[in-house]
């Protein structure tokens, strides 16, 4: 049986958690990241999302090497789909930097938004946690 394949915007906190737990292959964030690597998830992004990844992953509080940050960017650009932002969303988020993730997801109807903390986002079926994405993928 072929595993499900999906499009998804991956929030920065999911990437951070996946890299921090990369030695724990059973963590849901690691499984989501692995699904990107093996082609089951096609990540959606734009330049603002890439900039957010680089800025957050480059913070001194994280034990990431420059190569880790570059690898994430190369991965997204190589296997991902670059999209624009929709302008149809007029909601409010506690963190204004989160809006771009939601708007890029709104640019592709059949996509998901994978978030570690979904409580600050509109309750929509396409806004999912890493655990929910693992289930959607049938992992």
Residue ranges and their predicted role:
Residues 1-43:
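Short, well-structured N-terminal submotif of metal-dependent ribonuclease cores
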Residues 12, 47, 116-118:
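Short secondary-structure boundary segments
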Residues 15-16, 51, 120-122:
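Short, active-site-adjacent cap segments at secondary-structure transitions
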Residues 17-19, 56, 124, 136-137:
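Residues that scaffold the ATP/ADP-binding catalytic core of kinase and kinase-like folds
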Residues 33-88:
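PIN-domain endoribonuclease scaffold, especially VapC-family toxins
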Residues 77-113:
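Active-site neighborhoods of divalent-metal-dependent phosphate/nucleic-acid chemistry enzymes
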Residues 108-112, 118-139:
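Acidic, PIN/NYN-like endoribonuclease modules and their adjacent C-terminal/linker elements
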């Amino acid at each position: 049986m072929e595993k499900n394949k999906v499009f998804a915007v991956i929030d920065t906190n999911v990437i951070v958690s996946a890299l921090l737990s990369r030695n724990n292959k059973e963590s849901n964030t690691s499984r989501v990241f692995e699904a990107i690597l093996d082609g089951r998830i096609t990540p959606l992004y734009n330049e603002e999302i890439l900039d957010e990844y680089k800025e957050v992953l480059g913070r001194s509080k994280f034990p990431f090497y420059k190569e880790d940050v570059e690898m994430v960017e190369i991965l997204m650009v190589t296997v991902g789909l670059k999209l624009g932002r929709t302008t149809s969303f007029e909601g409010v988020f506690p963190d204004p930097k989160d809006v771009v993730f939601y708007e890029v997801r709104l640019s592709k109807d059949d996509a998901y938004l994978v978030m570690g903390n979904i409580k600050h986002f509109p309750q929509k079926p396409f806004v999912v946690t890493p655990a929910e994405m693992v289930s959607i993928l049938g992992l």
